[in-house]
Amino acid sequence: MVIIGFRVQNFYFNVMKVMSKISGFLLLTVALSAAEKIDIKAGSNHWAFQPLKNPALPVVKNKSWPSNPIDYFILARLEQAGLEPAPPAENRVLQRRIHYALRGLPPNDETDLDKLMSTLQYGERWARHWLDVVRYADSNGLDENSAHANAWRYRDYVVNAFNSDKPFNRFVIEQIAGDLLKAKDEVHRRELVTATGFLSLGPKVLAEPDKVKMEMDIIDEQIDTLGKSFLGLTLGCARCHDHKFDPIPTADYYALAGIFKSTKTMNSLKTIAKWHENPVYTPKEKKLREKSEELIAAQKKVIAAFTQKVNQELLIERKLDKLPPKPQELYTKSVKAEIEGLQDTLKRLESQAFILPMAMGVTDGNATELPIFVRGDHNRPAKKLQPRQFPRILSDAQPLTGKTSGRLELAKWITDEKNPLTARVIVNRVWRWHFGRGLVATTDNFGLLGQKPSHPDLLDHLAVWFVRNGWSIKKLNKLILSSSTYRMVSHGSTKAMKEDPENRLLSRAPLRRLEAEPLRDSLLEMAGLLDKKVGGYIWTFENYKLVFNHTSEDATTYESNRRALYLPVIRNHVYNLFELFDFPDPGTVNGNRTDSTIAPQALFLMNSPLILRTTEAMTKQILADKKLTNSQSVERLYVKVYKRPPTALELKRAVAFVSNFAKDRQAGW
């Protein structure tokens, strides 16, 4: 019976094994045939895949309102709906709006847009927008939350790119393939390789036992990030099957994946895996490191020579044939003390050794092509390799045949003026960063599941204008901020509020909340505590080391007075203030921050350590002038915080409140 049972069981196992192979073959056949059946031509009819056009300015009735071309497109839609634009905002309100838009800080007396964009704070403000999109973080997250101790160099690269108004098409190319570009000099080379941190910053399962799966997961994350960031397409959806909505077959996904398979992102895939980093040190810094290594090596020789001498003397004195397993147990106190002194010197030299600057980034590997993996399973590869190529919905280019990865060709294709998506996607992002909602509300998805543009002609006009003006973000900002559309008040007419409650037609300026970073920075600025040093890092974690200790406690501190941009962004454990005020998930692309209203926000603004520290500093400033009356002090405080004098009622209530603390003015204020 046992033998019969075994045979039945074995027969069942073999049948299931055969069925599994048949199933895999059928799935593979279906996947390959489906890839050929997707109608790329029909899919190209989607609005986002149409070539850019430059529509004529609409004819409007109210010819005195438009200040620049933007206003014609907005006003035409308003007039079509029977609505009128809101009146212009007063200068004080407009100044506040513009300063937060360009600098992320409370307004000063500067009114010139060009001068505001020439401040170093401009690059810091706009870099943070881009860092949302590229899922910037100072740690890996996921299973092994290792420190990205050199990620800050990419962050500083982005700050410098916005401050220098690097053309956006060049900005894109450098992030995808900076290491493949010809550098003007050594400084420029370091900048270019640092830019490729864009591809390396994503979260990775560093302890994944299946190395092929780990690599394909990393490639998938790169494709997903690249697609959403620059093209507004969810390319990653085609990994396991043809895209359910957009005309992107699985074959196109693996053709693109071959480019990143040919790119070296990781130094090692062994547990725990380590990402690749590019050297960004100067010849002088290299010599400093070599000198440190020489001193360390020399000290090790001193220790070895002294230990050998002591051991030889030990053999002679003790008349031993050989040393015991632990000869140090036989050392005298004086010998032990001398060895400890030598080892302390070694530790000091090692701790003071010059660390060579490195930057997260990628480099080219061996040119490789991939087959389709059925359902994304690398254990079920098709026999046919997919030549490296760009998505066919947007390109009729021939497959890549060179010995390089193809990243440079990919970057040039993405930034080609004939590509209908790249310029549309970035001008839409800039619009969203100013108005709180993009002309296409789904900023990261221009595919069939994304929303249609509210003002399609304006979107195309801006995209064409942007390209013709050298892909300049600063020029685009100036165009938008100079428009009558941007300068309206935020309260509309009763009719507009009723017929356009969501303000999709932009009959009024949108009400905008301060994000977490400008909120924090403003508190420090008003308290006179903000450290405006630009660039560098404040984090002290060693590269690749876990940011959590053995008790799962994160020792990261956020007490610095530097701008919020420079505070560590820890995946799986975002700073409380950031999290409280809707900081995006740093593990995914996010070009569209959300707004929430929750009780802890009010509690934070009442009694958090940051609030107590900054209000105490402001109080000391107010009380320092003994000549001021309570009324004058209240007026000064209002102007400092709100950039306006208090109303009569506000003044009356504030004076009455602080008057109750005559014996303890510090507490009252």
Question: Model-found features: residue ranges?
Answer:
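Electrostatic cytochrome c docking/interface patches
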Residues: 34, 59, 214-226, 330-333, ...
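Post-cleavage N-terminal segment of exported redox proteins
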Residues: 35-57, 128, 148, 161-218, ...
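Hydrophobic h-region of N-terminal signal peptides that target proteins for export
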Residues: 26-35
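Primarily short, surface-exposed interaction patches in extracytoplasmic proteins
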Residues: 62-97, 101-122, 129, 135-184, ...
